[in-house]
């Protein structure tokens, strides 16, 4: 597997930076590193999903949240999410931190995702202009449609999306009740 030249920020379980490592090496060794998942909703409350490019280093062709990646060492997860959303989906939307979680998942190509994943949300009615190197397709789904599809075909969604979907949904409901 080739290296990318990109680095990830290695962290401890308290999200304190303990160093950096080349991205593919961190995924081969399963080292805990900082990441983010950015969820975008339109004014109808629909979830913006992207289908990952088929040649991504893992989870190619699977559906996931609007944008996910790794912050650079000098930037916050929310700043990185805002930046990467523009790069991947051609959208500008300010990321708002929601929560974070740790997960570990091994893939069939011997890569391991072990991430402290910062979940951010944002709202936009702007239509995406996806970067074809990152994204094959996109779509908007209402919550009920998304839940039905995830129940019917969970294997079509990334592992991190399946892990945090319910918590994102619950936090959104809480935010809407307090608004």
Regions found by a protein language model. Name each.
Residues 38, 67, 97, 118-120:
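A structural signal for short, well-ordered beta-strand segments
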Residues 27, 33, 70, 114, ...:
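Histidine-centered active-site/metal-ligand motif
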Residues 22, 61, 73, 102, ...:
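Nudix hydrolase/Nudix homology domain
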Residues 35-67:
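A glycine-rich, hydrophobic loop/mini-helix early in the fold
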Residues 48-49, 64-98:
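The catalytic Nudix box helix
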């Amino acid at each position: 597997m080739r290296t990318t030249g990109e680095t990830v920020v290695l962290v401890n379980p308290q999200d304190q930076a303990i160093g950096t490592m080349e991205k593919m090496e961190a995924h081969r060794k399963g080292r805990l590193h900082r990441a983010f998942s950015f969820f975008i909703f339109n004014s109808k409350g629909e979830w913006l999903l992207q289908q990952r490019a088929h040649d991504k280093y893992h989870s190619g062709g699977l559906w996931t949240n609007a944008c996910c990646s790794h912050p650079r060492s000098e930037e916050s997860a929310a700043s990185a999410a805002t930046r990467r959303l523009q790069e991947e989906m051609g959208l500008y939307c300010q990321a708002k931190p929601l929560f974070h979680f740790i997960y570990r998942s091994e893939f069939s190509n011997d890569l391991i995702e072990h991430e402290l994943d910062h979940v951010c949300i944002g709202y936009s009615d702007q239509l995406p202009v996806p970067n074809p190197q990152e994204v094959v397709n996109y779509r908007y789904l209402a919550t009920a449609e998304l839940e039905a599809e995830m129940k019917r075909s969970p294997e079509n969604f990334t592992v991190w999306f399946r892990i945090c979907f319910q918590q994102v949904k619950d936090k959104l409901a809480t935010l809407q009740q307090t608004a």
